[in-house]
Swiss-Prot record:
Protein's name according to its UniProt entry: Quaternary ammonium compound-resistance protein QacC
Keyword Transport: yes
Primary localization class, coarse: membrane
Record key words, sorted: Cell membrane, Membrane, Plasmid, Transmembrane, Transmembrane helix, Transport
Species per Swiss-Prot/TrEMBL record: Staphylococcus sp. (strain ST827)
InterPro entries: Small_drug/metabolite_transptr, Small_multidrug_res
Amino acid sequence: MPYIYLIISISTEVIGSAFLKSSEGFSKFIPSLGTIISFGICFYFLSKTMQHLPLNITYATWAGLGLVLTTVVSIIIFKEQINLITIVSIVLIIVGVVSLNIFGTSH
């Protein structure tokens, strides 16, 4: 169940980040509201995850996968450009997250 919580947290973090970009500095009501609601849900489920998984694995997975998925959203929805260094860095993040989850410590 903790990984379900983590998936929900990561997903709502990515949604919240997309809303945040769309809110244009909180000047648009609906995207601003979406940002607040999404991040509220995100942190609720992140805290539920931390009740079951170690902080180091939880946070590294949340931050790493959130960054990767946010990058994908920024490319697809906002038409932002990336370069080779960005791609290599994302691959390294994925390798790090997978390694932590396979070989990292548990309680």
